[in-house]
Amino acid sequence: MPSTTRTSNSQNEIVMRLSGSDRVLVIMAKAPRPGAVKTRLTPNLSPEAVTAFYCCLLDDTLALARSLETAGVEVAIMCPGSDVNELARLAGTQLLGKAASVVAQKGEGLAAGLTSVFAHFAEAHRTNAHRTNAHRRRIIAFNSDSPHLPRSVLEDAFETLAAHDVVVGPTHDGGYYLVGAKASHPTLFAGDGMGTSSAMERLLSRARALELSVGFADRFYDIDTADDLSRLAEELRLAPARAPRTAAWLKEWESTAH
């Protein structure tokens, strides 16, 4: 059972103590503020509409993550320090009473956030200096805009990570929607290229330089552009249960846009 929520004096971390599972799914998120999230959608949607849409994505992503808890996977959120309190409040209905945490990243940007994920969750689990590779904690960082991803893909990614140093879920645009590791590798996300069409290739190049074995999850897509939005709307029209809150928002958006 998790202990009572603790808030640090610096407000950098709000934590419900982890139970020690060997698998953690960490959602990379931001507080939903106009102009701060999914900005590439603003030519087609107002900043306020984008923010409302992002809230739906985040809610459904948390629900997807929570569905893995029955299999012993812990759920956490990594975010900028200024967003911790707001995300903890918004995620309260999803995380209340569960073994989960909302943790502030160290530094700015996605690369710093990903580095923080593995530094925080791998180091927190290092209770035995002689822990074997097979029993090291498997940590996967997952974006907050692919709530329609089949749960089986996440389950398979954890299995793939058991046999490799790193697991990557490629996107169709050259990036990646998830990345996992069993240890902290500070240079794995160093340099530029995050959020670009060369992001995955740069990651693989750094993994090779570190002599890390890499396994792959299924290729998928996240929601960055108007085309992605239309594709998602079409898929959820046929299967709204995959991301119900997002599906409802898209249905209303389509009815007012046409």
Regions inferred by a protein language model and the residue ranges of each:
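A short, N-terminal amphipathic alpha-helix
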Residues: 54-71
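Conserved donor-nucleotide/metal-binding helix-loop-beta segment in metal-dependent transferases, i.e.
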Residues: 149-173
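Conserved alpha/beta core of the MobA/IspD/sugar-nucleotide pyrophosphorylase nucleotidyltransferase superfamily
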Residues: 197, 201, 205-258
